[in-house]
């Protein structure tokens, strides 16, 4: 009489075990079950099968991990398809929310980011390496394992009320998009904007998200007081290319419409042609600027593709998957602009690179903005209207 192990039944061809193949063989031999008669499927979590609708194709470990995880084909069928990765949001209570920098090539010295990670999933995002500080992967983790900071408005109010605080424009969206999809549920960006508006504090916002239209009531009021300007990033006008490299970002035409609606509300808008990818999206530079101008943008800027740390292998993996015929040429152009390396992090070099190709793109930009009548300097914002917030329980000033 033959005994069939409980988890492997001849009548259930689709059954599977989550064990090692060698252990399955020993188990079947011990129960005198001919191994060749049964198909045992191994459940294996492969990111390639689960990354549909995401920018990154893998979830490689970060530079701080001591061990590297790799997939190996053991000859078994991969089993039933696992569901696509879902976005997970956890909560962080920050001690501070304003981050200061001394970078000479940035037009601001402070910023706030109310989320860590970004569901937009732009494969080229230079902020991906920041997820490594959290013990997470700059790959798929960056766009699926997000962190919200719901106490950010209260912390911001406290920092603005500090006696030693000196007012200067704050940037929002420098690391992750403040209007990414999870903002619809959490509303942290809107609450922070209200704090800034009440205090008369200037703010510059960078986004790709349509959700900014929800806050036109606050933004238009701040614009009338000279307290806000907005940058809308448009990487390409090609909808197919956009879906591939920034899968959860509004389509290019929709982003141009955001510019139009903000401009109609009297909000100063900049069209940001960034990042420009050589031999892929940079031929569209003039068309992007023209579309932004037609929609009401007052100013324009551009940045070349940046590949810091873990971003380089992610982008190269993406190029090999979607544009194998251009991958070599694109990487050659980037290395040409960064002294033979994938990326040069030096101030003044990192944003646009150097060399003939970088200068050619810069010259095209200068000619285009002059022809279109676009400014390159941002709209000036006022700092003289700032009044420190009065915290609950604090004594109000008599003067």
Put a short name on every predicted segment.
Residues 1-4, 8, 12-19, 23-26, ...:
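Short terminal hydrophobic/aromatic SLiMs and anchors at protein ends
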Residues 5, 171-174, 270-274:
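Short beta-strands and strand-loop turn motifs
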Residues 32-89, 93, 99-100, 283-399:
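Auxiliary Fe-S-binding modules of radical SAM enzymes
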Residues 80-116, 120-231, 235-243, 251-264:
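Conserved Radical SAM active-site core
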Residues 195-201, 258-269, 337-340, 364-375:
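A structural motif corresponding to the C-terminal end of an alpha-helix
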Residues 205, 237-239, 245-248, 261-282, ...:
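Conserved strand-turn element in the central/C-terminal portion of the radical SAM core barrel
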Residues 210-213, 277-286:
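Active-site glycine- and acidic-residue-rich loops that bind
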Residues 224-227, 268, 294-298:
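Glycine-enriched alpha-helix->loop->beta-strand junction motifs that scaffold or abut catalytic
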């Amino acid at each position: 009489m033959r005994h069939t192990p409980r988890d492997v039944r001849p009548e259930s061809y689709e059954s599977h075990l989550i064990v090692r193949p060698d252990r399955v063989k020993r188990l079947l031999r011990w129960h005198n079950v001919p191994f060749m008669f049964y198909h045992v499927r191994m459940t294996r979590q492969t990111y390639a099968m689960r990354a549909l609708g995401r920018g990154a194709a893998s979830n490689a470990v970060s530079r701080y991990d001591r061990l590297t995880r790799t997939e190996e084909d053991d000859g078994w069928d991969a089993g039933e398809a696992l569901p696509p990765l879902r976005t997970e949001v956890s909560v962080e209570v920050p001690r501070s929310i304003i981050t200061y920098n001394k970078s000479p090539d940035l037009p601001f010295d402070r910023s706030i980011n109310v989320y860590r990670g970004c569901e937009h999933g732009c494969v080229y995002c230079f902020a991906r390496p920041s997820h490594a500080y959290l013990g997470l992967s700059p790959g798929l983790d960056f766009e699926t394992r997000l962190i919200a900071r719901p106490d950010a408005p209260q912390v911001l109010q406290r920092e603005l009320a500090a006696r030693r605080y000196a007012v200067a424009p704050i940037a929002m969206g420098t690391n992750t998009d403040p209007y990414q999809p999870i903002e619809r549920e959490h509303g942290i960006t809107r609450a922070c904007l209200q704090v800034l508006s009440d205090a008369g504090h200037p703010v510059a916002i960078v986004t790709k998200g349509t959700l900014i239209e929800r806050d036109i009531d606050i933004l238009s009021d701040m614009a009338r007081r000279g307290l806000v300007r907005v940058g809308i990033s448009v990487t390409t006008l090609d909808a197919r290319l956009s879906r591939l490299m920034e899968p959860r970002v509004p389509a290019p035409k929709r982003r141009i419409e955001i510019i139009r609606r903000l401009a109609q509300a009297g909000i100063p808008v900049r069209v940001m042609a960034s990042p420009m990818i050589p031999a892929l999206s940079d031929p569209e530079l003039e068309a992007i600027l023209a579309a932004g101008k037609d929609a009401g943008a007052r100013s324009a800027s551009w940045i070349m593709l940046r590949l810091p740390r873990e971003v380089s292998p992610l982008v190269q993996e993406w190029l090999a998957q979607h544009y194998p015929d251009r991958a070599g040429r694109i990487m050659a152009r980037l290395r040409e602009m960064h002294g033979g390396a994938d990326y040069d992090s030096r101030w003044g070099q990192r944003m646009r690179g150097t060399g003939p190709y970088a200068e050619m793109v810069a010259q095209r930009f200068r000619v285009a903005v002059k022809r279109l009548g676009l400014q390159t300097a941002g709209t000036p914002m006022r700092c003289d209207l700032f009044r420190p917030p009065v915290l609950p329980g604090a004594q109000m000033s008599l003067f």
